[in-house]
Regions:
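Short acidic-hydrophobic, aromatic-tinged amphipathic segments that line or gate anion-handling sites
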Residues: 2-11
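Short beta-strands and strand-loop turn motifs
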Residues: 22-24, 54-55, 88-92, 117-122, ...
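N-terminal catalytic cores of NTP/NDP-binding nucleotidyl/phosphoryl-transfer enzymes
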Residues: 10-72
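Glycine-rich, highly charged phosphate/nucleotide-binding loops
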Residues: 67-76, 97-105
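Phosphate/ribose-recognition catalytic cores of enzymes acting on nucleotide-derived substrates
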Residues: 196-331
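A glycine-rich helix N-cap at a beta->alpha junction
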Residues: 75-89
Length: 331
């Protein structure tokens, strides 16, 4: 078990006694998760305690996911802090998978963490084989003097119940606009810009090429209006962009196989995000860049030649800039 202080990520020896701890996996840190953490924050304020989260590590031993992740742990920690948590207790699944519900409450929550209150969502399950639900958690915590708050389901502005499973499906289907409503922010990933042969520049549309970190979701193949962010001279810059996601996007094939291999991407599965950044003509190779998906523009398309390709990229760039301006204001 590792305890991090947020937002720095520094490891600390102990969680302050009497903390209010939100329980969950928190993939995506969506609106439902934020409601849980906000409840923990308010409970902590009332008790003069610290708000914290407990979660299973996606990068630790023994935990096997059957789906790609919405957020990596680094992103998750930053979002948890933004939502109100001040400590993150991260457990390797191998350390807790054999614990019965009663053992988890007694050994982890009561003895190791010394919490005063736990907060969870209605669907939270724990214990060996996920055998205990939120009602069972309340009963077990009552037995050892820990208070329990169960937060009801949260819906988005369209009235749909928010869940990580639904968000993954929406992203996979390319409906990033609906996913963004449940997340409460645009879906995004951050990764290093890969070096290529600069083929985009030869047709007047320089692009950056990125491969998300292993295990991360990418939307359905196609073209998206995006917001592109990176630091320049210590200042965060934001630009409108048109991103093409696919196995072999328009000019992303200029990313050599040895570069992809260094990123751990097999040739047969090299889904690349290739992004044209409107109004930017600088150098970003080797730098960390964040791409935020705003809206799907179109599916994949074959082109008869360079002229047709250039015309389509130009139309995509105009459409993407209009969407960006609607959300963020004119550049």
């Amino acid at each position: 078990m590792t305890i991090f202080s947020l937002p720095t990520g520094a490891v600390v020896d102990r969680l302050p006694t009497g903390a209010v701890v939100a329980l969950g996996y928190f993939d995506g840190v969506h609106l439902g998760h934020r409601a849980i953490i906000d409840t923990a924050r308010r409970e902590a304020e009332a008790r003069d305690a610290v708000p914290a989260v407990w979660m299973i590590s996606s990068e630790g031993g023994g935990y096997k996911r059957d789906s790609l992740e919405i957020t990596c742990e680094e992103e998750k920690h930053a979002l948890l802090y933004e939502a109100g948590a001040r400590y993150a207790v991260v457990h390797d699944f191998s350390e807790v998978r054999g614990l019965a519900g009663e053992e988890f409450v007694r050994l982890v929550l009561k003895e190791a963490l010394r919490v005063s209150c736990v907060v969870c969502g209605k669907n939270f399950r724990f214990g060996k084989g996920a055998s205990v639900d939120s009602d069972g958690l309340r009963t077990l915590c009552d037995n050892v003097g820990i208070d329990t708050v169960v937060v009801p389901h949260v819906t988005d502005v369209c009235g749909d119940t928010v869940s990580s499973t639904k968000i993954r499906r929406l992203i996979t289907d390319g409906d990033v606009e609906a996913a963004d409503l449940m997340l409460g922010r645009p879906y995004s990933f951050t990764s290093t810009v890969l070096e290529g042969k600069r083929l985009g520049r030869t047709i007047g549309f320089p692009t950056i090429n990125q491969v998300p970190k292993q295990g991360r979701l990418l939307p359905k193949n196609g073209v998206y209006a995006v917001c592109v962010e990176f630091f320049d001279g210590g200042v965060r810059r934001s630009y409108a962009g048109a991103a093409n996601v696919g196995v072999c996007p328009t000019v992303a094939s200029d990313v050599s196989e040895d570069v992809l291999a260094r990123e751990g991407v097999a040739c047969a599965e090299r889904r690349v995000c290739e992004t044209y950044i409107a109004g930017f003509d600088g150098e970003l190779y080797g730098r960390e860049v964040t791409v935020r998906f705003l809206r799907r523009l179109r599916g994949e398309k074959a082109f008869s030649g360079i002229d047709e390709l250039k015309e389509q990229i130009s139309r995509d760039a105009v459409a993407a800039a209009q969407i960006y301006n609607e959300i963020y204001g004119k550049q």
